[in-house]
């Protein structure tokens, strides 16, 4: 097996509409840190790719009567009729040893385009349910995932007793309800607080911190190679 084949794969799913944003610069910094550590990095830019986030009945074979999205996902997996765009994304997801969700924190959660990616690509019957279980028995067990994001507010707002409250509490629905649910080991998030309020020098220092934080992630345990 070649060194290239043996390299772990990181999939970065990026969701920011502005290519010149600090958030996008943060994603690029993280991607380079992973490459420097020997990862093959696959970057999926949802806005650039004009990803359609809505999970609807039109992407499935005709359904008579009541439409249940997850049941139709599982049927599409079993019958080999998944929407081509979804199947391509699913293949990239399953090939990755590390998933990085890169985004600005909007309304204390994921931007709609990224939540829609999860809705459509975390396919029932392919990553959980059907022949797979949940959590430790789901299809992505043994793989790692992390959040890489920016906030509008300062760090002190996201602490226990702060104006917003504990960041751990805020992220529970993503960490537990999305990532751990399909089997991932969830790593500590990499967060830049309030970059819009920083000077250029402070933003440069923040990117250095991101680089160092992601390098530590990359240096952590990696999946065994057959």
Annotated model-derived regions:
Residues 127-181:
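Short, glycine-/small-residue-rich phosphate/pyrophosphate-handling segment
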Residues 94, 140, 184-185:
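Structured loop/turn residues at beta-strand edges in well-structured enzyme cores
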Residues 11-13, 42-44, 146-148, 187-190:
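Hydrophobic/aromatic beta-strand patches that form the interior of the parallel beta-sheet core
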Residues 2-127, 205-226:
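N-terminal beta1-alpha1-beta2 submodule of the flavodoxin-like/Rossmannoid cofactor-binding fold
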Residues 27, 58, 116, 134, ...:
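Flexible domain-boundary/linker segments
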Residues 14-16, 152, 191-195:
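Short, histidine-centered active-site or binding-site loop motifs used for metal coordination
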Residues 3-4, 157-226:
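Glycine-rich phosphate/pyrophosphate-binding loop and the adjoining helix
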Residues 78-81, 137, 198, 202:
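Pocket-edge positions in alpha/beta enzyme catalytic cores
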């Amino acid at each position: 097996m070649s060194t290239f084949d043996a390299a772990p794969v990181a999939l970065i799913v990026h969701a920011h509409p502005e290519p010149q944003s600090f958030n996008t610069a943060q994603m690029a910094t993280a991607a380079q840190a992973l490459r420097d550590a020997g990862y093959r990095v696959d970057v999926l830019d949802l806005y650039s790719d004009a990803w359609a986030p809505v999970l609807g009945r039109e992407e499935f074979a005709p359904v008579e009567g009541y439409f249940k999205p997850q049941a139709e996902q599982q049927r599409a997996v079993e019958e080999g009729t998944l929407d081509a765009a979804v199947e391509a994304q699913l293949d990239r997801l399953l090939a990755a040893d590390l998933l990085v969700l890169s985004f600005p924190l909007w309304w204390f959660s994921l931007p709609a385009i990224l939540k829609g990616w999860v809705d459509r690509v975390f396919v029932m019957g392919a990553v959980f349910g059907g022949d797979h279980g949940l959590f430790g028995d789901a299809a992505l067990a043994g793989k790692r995932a992390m959040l890489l994001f920016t906030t509008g507010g300062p760090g002190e707002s996201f602490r226990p007793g702060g104006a917003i409250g504990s960041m751990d509490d805020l992220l529970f629905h993503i960490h537990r309800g999305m990532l751990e649910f399909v089997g991932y080991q969830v790593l500590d998030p990499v967060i830049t607080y309030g970059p819009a309020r920083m000077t250029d020098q402070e933003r440069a220092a923040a990117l250095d911190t991101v680089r160092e934080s992601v390098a530590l992630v990359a240096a952590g345990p990696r999946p065994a190679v057959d």
